[in-house]
Amino acid sequence: MSYLLRKPQSHEVSNGVKLVHEVTTSNSDLTYVEFKVLDLASGSSYTEELKKQEICIVAVTGKITVTDHESTFENIGTRESVFERKPTDSVYISNDRAFEITAVSDARVALCYSPSEKQLPTKLIKAEDNGIEHRGQFSNKRTVHNILPDSDPSANSLLVVEVYTDSGNWSSYPPHKHDQDNLPEESFLEETYYHELDPGQGFVFQRVYTDDRSIDETMTVENENVVIVPAGYHPVGVPDGYTSYYLNVMAGPTRKWKFYNDPAHEWILER
């Protein structure tokens, strides 16, 4: 199995709370992005104290209440399945704060972390405030829900987005990268992909590769897998009959998403 691919686990961290994924700077090649997925049984709670990190808590499915002990957001979350294809609620919390998540129903929650030193206000990112985009043409069409885009100044370094790609289409395509701190041409952003498939027995293909091929990994990615992108191009292909969902987390030294297309494939945009 590729070192960039993570399969789901089911490790109980407290009563009613299971850890599905944990990507950290200690167990990966990432420096800026950390990522967790938790399953919470109805009525259970998860607490954590942030140090020099900010977090975006995404209510992937189910309903939750989130508090940082100053602000409380009750009964947030909009869907039982990501394939309802509607935006969900999220909460941004800045560094040096503690938070608690309580499950109002059975819930899956994504915790998206990046470094932060400047404290910003806690914020509820309502589902209706997610910007929705339809990108691409031909067989490269996808729908994007922008949770924390770079146009929103609510965070110091985090960028968070959900993407839906229909059967037979490609996403993050033509292949693009953002691994050079060379603005305005390109920004350096690490990235994680949390994947789900409909139907659940499906898979997608994802390739992560650099120009010099020092990274060149092609992966069969199944439901609830995570792909780590420390650098390089990272396209996703969705086979016929299946729909792809993924949650992206990005962060780097500058909070700007400026990508560079692989010159070998940029002609695709000129059709």
Swiss-Prot record:
Reactions catalysed according to its record: 5-deoxy-D-glucuronate = 5-dehydro-2-deoxy-D-gluconate
InterPro entries: Deoxy-glucuronate_isom_IolB (IPR024203), IolB_Bacilli (IPR023770), KduI/IolB_isomerase (IPR021120), RmlC-like_jellyroll (IPR014710), RmlC_Cupin_sf (IPR011051)
Protein's UniProt keywords contain Amino-acid biosynthesis: no
Any one biological process term the GO annotation gives: inositol catabolic process
SUPFAM superfamilies the record matches: RmlC-like cupins (SSF51182)
Domain of life of the organism encoding this protein: Bacteria
Top-level EC class as recorded in UniProt: isomerase
Enzyme Commission (EC) number: 5.3.1.30
Keywords annotated in UniProt: Isomerase
Associated pathway: Polyol metabolism; myo-inositol degradation into acetyl-CoA; acetyl-CoA from myo-inositol: step 4/7
Record function comment: Involved in the isomerization of 5-deoxy-glucuronate (5DG) to 5-dehydro-2-deoxy-D-gluconate (DKG or 2-deoxy-5-keto-D-gluconate).
NCBIfam families: myo_inos_iolB
Protein family per UniProt: Belongs to the isomerase IolB family.
Name the record gives this protein: 5-deoxy-glucuronate isomerase
Gene from which this protein is expressed: iolB
